[in-house]
Amino acid sequence: MNETNDEGDRTLAGNSVTQRLDQEVHDFAMRTRFFHEDMTPGRARTFVRQHRLNTRQRNSVLKLRVATNCPDWDIRMRILDACTQEVIADEEHGGGRAHWQILEQLGVAIGMDLEGDIRAAKPLASTQMCWHAWDGLMSNTHWLEGLIANTCAERANIPGYGQGVMRE
């Protein structure tokens, strides 16, 4: 049963959709080692390599499939704006740099070689598996399912999920 709460958010049986998504993302963060283990130098390097690849693939290919299938112009424009921040330039949070460029700078700052270590990185099997799963959600299902998959993936980057350093 759909209702509306005091803030005007759509709700499902008294819980806002956003609250439910937040709970799912939090539960994922609590059961996934990445969100509560120490950030070792090796994990930091792997994060730079894989997240840089993921930022480019998900935002230049996969999210655009959702935007293409979305019939709502305003939502489509918000998806494209988010992709632009990730791939071209983020004036709001990145000082005009794309998110993949920020990750390259982070890698260099922790001692990684830009060409040989960061740009030459290949996706891990787990990264490829995630891309295949997202491809299925964003290409072969209703556009809302792709939007929800994108939303959950992005919300995990917002401080407040999991515990320890990743929560901050």
Outline where the language-model segments fall:
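Terminal targeting/low-complexity segments that flank the catalytic cores of oxidoreductases
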Residues: M1-M77, A121-L124, L137-E145, N157-E168
